[in-house]
């Protein structure tokens, strides 16, 4: 196994790049991963060059930045159309890795982050992982360990993007409903019978039945059970707890809800 073990003694400005015998090309899991981008943020030129060389050797695209500020400026203008992950040195002059992670959380969903450091301690690792980091690699590290971490992060980002598309699809369907249709959907979700709904909305039962059929069409539900599941998920999206979770970046609550949405929409 070939290793780009990278360690940096900043006090003595001594960079060590160890290499073992090379290996066969690392297999990328999917075409989607090959089209993904790995962002490298490290103030050490040799580290950036070594990582970009490693990623290029297995067919992965990368962009490197010497400072977190430079990445933030790029990220603000980037549309983020394809899956990506971030490989970041946790200790850098100016904005450090943990601070960068915090700033990204404030902007939007954070891409999977792989932290690396020659100086990382247990407390720092715990802080990074609690904030949502995917991995933490100490320098020096093996090429294979970095590639495994990167490919795992890219696969995770692809999955999260697919889940987000399912959520956006459900929200788009719900936005297409009129106020009365939304009220009808909520009452159906509450378990009310057609007669009860007709009484509350001052409608005939026939009109309620027609409204149900229209709801099925607009929500693209294949059956009534699926429609009720969609209504339950919409309530979850509207809850303050989940809304707060999106504002704070990806977390377990949002992930479980989006996974449920994806399952229901593909039933």
Predicted features, each with a name:
Residues 34-47, 51-55, 68, 86-89, ...:
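Conserved acidic segment of CheY-like receiver
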Residues 64-85:
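Acidic, metal-coordinating helix/loop segments flanking the phosphotransfer/catalytic sites
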Residues 73, 98-109, 127:
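Short amphipathic alpha-helix used as the core "switch/output" element in two-component signaling
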Residues 121-123, 137, 141-151, 196, ...:
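C-terminal output helix
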Residues 193-226:
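Recognition helix of helix-turn-helix DNA-binding domains
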């Amino acid at each position: 196994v070939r290793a780009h073990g990278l360690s940096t003694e900043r006090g003595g400005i001594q960079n060590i790049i160890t290499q073992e015998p090379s290996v066969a090309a690392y297999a990328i899991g999917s075409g989607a991963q090959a089209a993904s981008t790995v962002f490298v943020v490290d103030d050490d030129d040799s580290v950036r060059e070594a990582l970009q060389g490693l990623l290029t050797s297995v067919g992965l695209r990368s962009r490197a930045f010497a400072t977190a500020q430079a990445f933030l400026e790029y990220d603000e203008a980037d549309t983020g159309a394809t899956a990506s992950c971030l490989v970041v040195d946790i200790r850098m002059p100016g904005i450090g890795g943990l601070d960068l992670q915090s700033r990204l959380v404030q902007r939007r969903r954070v891409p999977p982050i792989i932290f690396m450091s020659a100086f990382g301690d247990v407390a720092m690792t715990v802080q990074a992982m609690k904030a949502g980091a995917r991995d933490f690699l100490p320098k020096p590290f093996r090429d294979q360990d970095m590639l495994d971490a990167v490919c795992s992060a890219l696969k995770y980002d692809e999955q999260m993007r697919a889940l987000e598309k399912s959520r956006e699809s459900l929200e788009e369907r719900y936005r297409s409903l009129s106020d009365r249709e939304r009220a009808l959907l909520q009452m159906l979700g509450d378990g009310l019978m057609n007669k009860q709904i007709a009484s509350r909305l001052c409608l005939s039962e026939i009109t309620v039945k027609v409204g149900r059929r229209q709801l099925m069409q607009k929500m693209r539900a294949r059956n009534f059970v699926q429609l009720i599941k969609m209504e339950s998920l919409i309530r979850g999206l509207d809850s303050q707890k989940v809304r707060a979770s999106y504002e704070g970046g990806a977390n377990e609550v949002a992930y479980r809800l989006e996974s449920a949405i994806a399952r229901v929409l593909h039933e």
